[in-house]
Amino acid sequence: MDFLRQCTLIQVMILAITIRLTHGGWTNFPESCVQLQPENAYDEMCDDSSLTNSNSIEYHNKLKSTKKFCILNQIKSVKTNLYRCYNISITSVCNSELSSQNLHQDYEVNPISRRDCLKHIIKNWNDENLERSLIQKSEDIYRTRCNFLKNTETKIEDYIIYQEKTESSVINADGLDSMIETKLIELESNKKLDNTVKTCISWEQGGDSRFNTLNLIALDLNLCLAKNSYKLEKCLLCYFFIGQDKWYRGEDGFMISIELSELDTKSIPKCEILWYRLYPGNLLTINQDYLAKKVQERNRGCNAVKSILRSGKAPPLENMIKYTIPLQAGYGIGFREKIEKTVYSAPLRGNLVERRNYDFFRCHYFPSKIKIVENKTHTPPINLCVYHFGKGSCHYPDNKYFISMNPVSFEENQHYPKSGQSFDYQSGLNGIRKKIKNQEYYIPDSFLMTLIYSSHTKSILEKTNITEVFRNDSNYENHTLQDYLGLFNKEDEGMRPERDLINLPNITSETEDDDTSDLNLELNKNLINKTSSGFSNDNSNVINIPSKEYNKTDIKTVGKINKTSIIINHEEKDYWHEEYNMWGLSGLSFLLLLALFYNKIKRKIKRKS
């Protein structure tokens, strides 16, 4: 009997461990959700270019035979985002007399070095708008308010980050100033590989189906991209296979290349470095075709559900859970079920009718593990503990009730396929329902994401070896990563993009008065060009810009400069404090009354005398 009891105890322990592992599966967890109108949400649902698309998964095992990667070195045309930084100094002089008032502003704009510019970009990395526009800021903090009968001089020191969108015919791997949109790079892998670098083509140019089957940014390398899209991390650096540091802002889809010598990585908060091997080794142990089939089923189901939603009907909750929750890290569309109750009235009776509907949200999704834990310091004591991928400690999400809905119940082990059995119903994103101490939680445990992330997390974090990196040039085939990085220290201006142009907006002020006269904007640009013989000065003409016709497209392009001064003389009086009008009216009234009172007293004195 004791032996049977021990066996039973072991079975119970195994079952408990199994359930705990079930809770430890991977999911795409929503954070920072903002509610959307349904039509706007439908447009963003079912993103087929997710991290786990069928092309990435079905042929990912071909990477095992790939010995070398290459970078896309030259294409016909590519859109490039360049960010440049400038220091701005604004001196405002208020001249106030009884006869006249005038505000004189002097703007000095100077280019900032690339090193300092990178620091500014780091500082503003998580802002919704990385670009700090001089046009926008000139309407608020840069506007000086003058006081009546006070001559004052104020100076403001600040900086701006200005974006330039250009179109280039060549992408250079050494273009250190370029912020290049992330491109899907593919490698022809179905031919016999030797020690030479194969052809690289862009995703859009891959007309042959053989090129459309391998996505080098999928899974292993994509986990690096996914980590960098998290707003919870200030930043993350990855040494990619082209030997450069890549700085990603994943939600915008572009990256910045920086020199190692330009920036000390220790000064960047919350950063870590992942070293990636050129040869990935064994990537997946699961059946590629099986996983690809499940992703394809999920995509078809999601589009079918979206069609039902667009028709004005409400699909069953289990189908919404199964097909619509995003697989991709970053921004995606989530939902919450709601029950709408309406009263149907008849002549002699009335019925209460319930109707299912959904609220939609745009959330920032994180591949995460979720566990139910008991924490007596929280109310209620049962809560969700979320482990985001790439972050060690768990946290308790603010919007935990976003997933604390009332879903369809599933058996706790149904969402994992049993050996030798077909897996159909739970092919998408399903969940389990667990009830603990009268508190019910829905754990959106994803079978697909569990297969993908659990197979890669450990191996990806253990890749610390520095191995060979090759440029798309046979002359660099035998160079190591350190040799390649050493090339950055060489002065090769021919490999770098032009950095001499500066785009400056026209500075104007706008008032709420519709009858405001046009601004007389005197633009005195002192263009100082540093040449071999010294400095030379240029002066531009005076430009009159109607304030109401001003828009963000009014941009002046200036040539090579080291300093630009913009002097603005405002003729309208909206720069005066509101107290000025009140003080002026009350002051004049007081003086008038005082004069009348004085004359009255003077007359009385004369009469008495």
UniProtKB/Swiss-Prot annotation:
Annotated TM spans: 582-599
Entry superkingdom: Viruses
Topological domains annotated Cytoplasmic: 600-609
Membrane topology: Single-pass membrane protein
Signal peptide as annotated in the record: 1-24
Family: Belongs to the ephemerovirus glycoprotein family.
Name the record gives this protein: Non-structural glycoprotein
